[in-house]
A protein has these predicted regions:
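SAM-dependent nucleic-acid methyltransferase catalytic core
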Residues: 1-17, 25, 74-187
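An N-terminal domain-cap segment
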Residues: 3-49
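Conserved S-adenosyl-L-methionine
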Residues: 29-85
Length: 187
């Protein structure tokens, strides 16, 4: 399977629409680090590097990519997403308390993905407040229920992007890495 045709999740500041432009500005590289990974949109659309590191401070988002990295877990996530109806009741059951209490990483990923895809606006993953349930699609013809129903088809493309995880402090200690983060860290 090729590159994903849409983001792993709808995420505020996700850069999905800008990713091709951003990738075009990148120099040739062997190491790529997403220090503030979010939806990983640039990582998912760029050519693979020898070493790729994804990191984000929010463990619920990182959990999605960890689940997708394991073939058996990714398949189970696909199955659960396919069985999840696009319903307001499901949207409303996804709260920060529920996510924090959920011990099953696959279920936590399913809940987070549903919230991201069914909320109005990309800020829907901010569980501190509700942006509302997305009923209508864009003027271009996309319909939220159809987007959710077909999202599991993208799992293999997202999974094949090859995401590795490192603590942020380890990322910044790579001697050959030049990034805004390393410039800030080393003044």
């Amino acid at each position: 399977m090729g590159k994903p045709r849409r983001p792993a999740l709808r995420y505020h500041g996700g850069k999905w629409l800008l990713a091709a432009w951003i990738v075009g500005l990148m120099p040739a590289h062997h190491i790529y680090v997403e220090t503030h990974g979010g939806a990983g949109s640039v990582l998912l659309q760029k050519p693979r590097a020898d070493t790729e590191v994804y990191n984000d401070v929010w463990n619920h988002v990182v959990n999605i990519f960890k689940v997708l990295r394991d073939p058996a877990r990714a398949e189970e996530l696909r199955r659960r997403c396919e069985l999840t109806p696009y319903a307001r009741a499901v949207f409303e059951e996804v709260t920060l308390e529920r996510l924090d209490a959920e011990r099953d990483p696959i279920e936590r990923a399913r809940l987070m993905l549903f919230r991201a895809w069914s909320g109005f606006g990309s800020g829907s993953v901010n569980l501190a407040h509700s942006t509302g349930f997305r009923i209508r699609g864009r003027r271009s013809g996309g319909h939220p229920a159809r987007e959710w129903a077909t999202w599991p088809e993208e799992i293999e493309a997202v999974r094949s992007a090859g995401v590795e995880f490192e603590p942020a402090t380890r990322q910044l200690e790579i001697p050959s890495l030049t990034s805004c983060a390393s410039e800030v860290a080393h003044g």
